[in-house]
């Protein structure tokens, strides 16, 4: 993503997981793990939306981890419809937490990566080690996607998304009374909207200091 990006391999359930790591300037304030779009449709950790999510996390002072899914780059294995990918991301989360113990964890995903991150978030809750925030962009809902996410989940979608239609995301969010941030006139890949997307994510996750006007 930049000259300071480090690439490393973490041992996973079926072999190496190929991960890009970016560190913020100064003392880290958190950990962020970013999941990329569908590998069978060209998705990699270098996808522009995935990189935008990583940049937003860096701007917040988070260490940003961007693994490649199975069969992408140097990551071992073959596409597993989100099951093995969930297992791999849990390994990355554990490794990242070991490297920076005590820091809050943000899970972020784009398209197919949202499906995987929702599964990861549920597994972490079940294990008693929940993430602190979940960010979903172009949310891909599948038959085995968990039906509930934390109430403070950040959900961002493009009005003109023709890959993941808005109506499906609304049908998933409605029973949870889950708010959704809608970008008018925006398609699935957020062309010409990446800077705005970054600002929205930063604003949604940044701690706020509110003062009462005198």
Where does each model-flagged region fall?
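Short, surface-exposed "cap/lid" segments of acyl-processing enzymes
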Residues: 14-16, 25-66
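N-terminal cap/lid segment of alpha/beta-hydrolase-fold proteins
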Residues: 1-27
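Alpha/beta-hydrolase active-site loop
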Residues: 79-99
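Short beta-strand/loop motif that positions the catalytic acidic residue
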Residues: 149, 154-157, 161
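Gly/Ala-rich beta-loop-alpha elbow adjacent to hydrolase catalytic centers
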Residues: 108-117
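Catalytic histidine-centered segment of alpha/beta-hydrolase-like enzymes
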Residues: 77, 186-198
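Short alpha-helix in the alpha/beta-hydrolase fold that links the catalytic acid
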Residues: 149-151, 165-173
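Acidic catalytic loop of the alpha/beta-hydrolase fold
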Residues: 159-164, 188-189
